[in-house]
């Protein structure tokens, strides 16, 4: 299962991403409540339809506040320009066996690599 980050969804909503379409068709794309919240704060066409579709994808688990703080401390994630949502996504992917994170955020990619969280490969 691949957790699709907000950065990928934003680009997909502007111009369809063929790889994401394929992952969706194969039920391999998952979402996270915080990604849905981030997208809900933006201007998106067919807002209700899109948010409903996202909510019906596989939902990655929400980690607790204490779990996020432990992750930040153990992996030394402070001072890297990551946000709270980024840390939550890292923790969430780490909880799901075999899961990967697909992001276009450079700082989040670097944190994944350093934390041992698998990244989904970009396909050009």
From Swiss-Prot:
One of its GO terms (biological process) is negative regulation of growth. Pfam families: PIN (PF01850). Keywords: Hydrolase, Magnesium, Metal-binding, Nuclease, Toxin-antitoxin system. Gene3D superfamilies: 5'-nuclease (3.40.50.1010). GO terms for molecular function: magnesium ion binding; RNA nuclease activity. Mg(2+) binds at residues 5, 86. The keyword Iron does not apply. It is an enzyme of class 3 (hydrolase). InterPro entries: PIN-like_dom_sf (IPR029060), PIN_dom (IPR002716), VapC_family (IPR022907). Belongs to the PINc/VapC protein family. Toxic component of a type II toxin-antitoxin (TA) system. An RNase. Upon expression in M.smegmatis inhibits colony formation. Its toxic effect is neutralized by coexpression with cognate antitoxin VapB32. This is Ribonuclease VapC32. It comes from Mycobacterium tuberculosis (strain ATCC 25618 / H37Rv). The gene is vapC32.
């Amino acid at each position: 299962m691949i957790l699709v980050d907000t950065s990928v969804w934003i680009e997909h909503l502007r111009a369809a991403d063929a790889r994401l379409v394929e992952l969706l068709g194969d039920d391999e794309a998952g979402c996270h409540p915080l990604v849905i919240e981030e997208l809900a704060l933006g201007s998106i066409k067919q807002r209700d339809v899109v948010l409903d579709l996202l909510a019906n994808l596989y939902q990655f688990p929400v980690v607790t506040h204490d779990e996020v703080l432990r992750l930040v401390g153990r992996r030394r994630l402070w001072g890297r320009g990551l946000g709270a949502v980024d840390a939550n996504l890292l923790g969430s992917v780490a909880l799901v066996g075999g899961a990967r994170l697909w992001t276009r955020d450079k700082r989040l990619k670097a944190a994944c690599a350093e934390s041992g969280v698998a990244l989904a490969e970009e396909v050009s």
